[in-house]
Amino acid sequence: MRKVLGVLMLISAITVEAQVNGEDRLGSWHMYFGTNRISNKFSIHSEAQLRYYEQAKNFNQLLLRAGLNYHIDANAWTTFGYGYIVTDGSFEEFPEETNSIEHRIFERFFLKNKVWEFNFEHRYTLEQRFLDFRDRTDVQHRMRYRLQMTVPLTNTFFLNFYDEIFINLQEDIFGQNRLYAALGINVTENLNLQLGYLKNHFSEAHYDRLQVAVTYNPDLRGVLKKKK
């Protein structure tokens, strides 16, 4: 009987914790990504994301990112950029609650390769994170690796999968892991839409998120040449 009560108490505690931190809610991420080619070697990366604990409500995070890409060749490029992130770290709303602010410097290296009809992309990231929690500040460093696979179904439709691991370069080495699957639509040569599902794992919490992403990659080289 004691064992049964113990199990029931454990289940109850887990359920309450999931309700408090929002693990039991299906959240949503609304995202825009852009790469504007300005020369044979350089392009500009732009990005905006709105993340919610629930479906388009209960704000979690605003992420704005921009960077300069240097294209080594068609299958390799680097990025140096800056990110501005506003985060509400609590699922519940509290009186006089303040959001944290992060200024992030990041460096990335991309490699692409193809195996049969499968298109692979390897993304390596280093981040220098300057965090302001209002009552204290902190500087943290992080490393990320993402393996992405894109599978064309037709000229219009494709599947996209990735797994990304976050490694902290200080205490608590494991940061998080993201596992993603999506159906994509090529609207034009430079514009695509994706509707996906993300499993976001932390050491003490696991979240499920729907993702809606718009990617627009216009080539501005012709426009810039005309202006000259």
Language model features with spans:
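Bacterial Sec-dependent N-terminal signal peptides
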Residues: 1-22
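Outer-membrane beta-barrel domain signature
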Residues: 19-23, 52-57, 92-100, 132-137, ...
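Start-of-domain marker
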Residues: 19-79
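Residues that define the transmembrane beta-barrel architecture of outer-membrane proteins
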Residues: 26-28, 60-62, 101-105, 139-143, ...
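Residues on the lipid-exposed face of transmembrane beta-strands in outer-membrane beta-barrel proteins
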Residues: 32-36, 66-70, 107-111, 145-151, ...
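Repeated loop/turn-to-beta-strand initiation elements of outer-membrane beta-barrel proteins
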Residues: 41-46, 75-80, 116-120, 155-159, ...
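Transmembrane beta-strands of outer-membrane beta-barrel pores
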Residues: 48-54, 82-88, 113-115, 126-130, ...
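Predominantly the C-terminal beta-signal and adjacent terminal strand-loop region
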Residues: 161, 173-228
